Amino acid sequence: MNSENSFSSSEHITVLLHEAVNGLALKENGIYIDGTFGRGGHSRFILSQLSSNGRLIAVDRDPRAIAEAHKIQDLRFQIEHNSFSHIPEICDKLNLVGKIDGILLDLGVSSPQLDEAERGFSFMKDGPLDMRMDTTQGLSAEEWLKQVSIEDLTWVLKTFGEERFAKRIATAIVDFNKSAVKNSTEFLSRTSQLAELISQAVPFKDKHKHPATRSFQAIRIFINSELDELESLLNSALDMLAPEGRLSIISFHSLEDRMVKHFMKKQSKGEDIPKGLPLREDQIQRNQKLRIIGKAIQPSDAEIQANPRSRSAILRVAERI
């Protein structure tokens, strides 16, 4: 094991480290996928539990995560620069479809991404309005906000941020950029500008939450197609897993968690059988594909105290039947 494979660093504390990896029920010779490498906390811990015959494929779309992954000098490990929705293509390329013993996902934005002002994820640090997890492709938040309509932005803020003042905020943003065109002034281009504009548009302030919190979340989710990515992975994950292969998924907001919970529940229940059929229960084939493992797990008080950003995390685990 390379000496660099520590489980955390000064800049990033891995959330639910032991719980998420334990959820995989690691086999020492198994083949695993870390779909969200980040800064490598989960990957390094998985590697520490595998034998020389084990294998770990890590995936991330953030170029900085890829650079961090290249520090791991381990023949059992490989990194793929891609989003986790492309795990099926990666498995197909490596001839691993149906052979994966576990897939781990740690959804959302990482602490380093939040802390690096130039990434544009945080309203707490002034930086360019970017918000892309993969800075090599796609529209930045600034570029998208220049062209979006009030109606479309309202929908995004409501759908992905559950923002009650979505119409007010959307109107303020679109009007600001329209005014910039008319008066030849600068468009919204900084996180601090956007946060201040949102704050002014919101009539009532929550004592415990910055008024820009939900809007920043919504714009980030839209820019990165986060829920589409998750839905795509969930729809294909079962075909990637070997029998008894595990899904271990950490989510950080209710939209993600509802998707994961609904998927696992549906696949563990199997197909609905029309009522009234002349069949006994033992004759019904429901085609169940997953078994839910335990209850949802949240961080301990000690973990939350050590890492307040872990507060909203929730882990769900299921096993392929």
Curated annotation (Swiss-Prot):
Annotated GO MF terms: rRNA (cytosine-N4-)-methyltransferase activity
UniProt KW keywords: Cytoplasm, Methyltransferase, rRNA processing, S-adenosyl-L-methionine, Transferase
Statement: the UniProt record of this protein carries the keyword Cell membrane: no
UniProt cross-references to Gene3D superfamilies, sorted A to Z: Putative methyltransferase TM0872, insert domain (1.10.150.170), Vaccinia Virus protein VP39 (3.40.50.150)
GO cellular component, one term: cytoplasm
Enzyme Commission code(s) on record: 2.1.1.199
InterPro entries: RsmH (IPR002903), SAM-dep_MeTrfase_MraW_recog (IPR023397), SAM-dependent_MTases_sf (IPR029063)
Enzyme class: transferase
Claim: Transferase is one of the keywords in the record: yes
Protein name from the UniProt record: Ribosomal RNA small subunit methyltransferase H
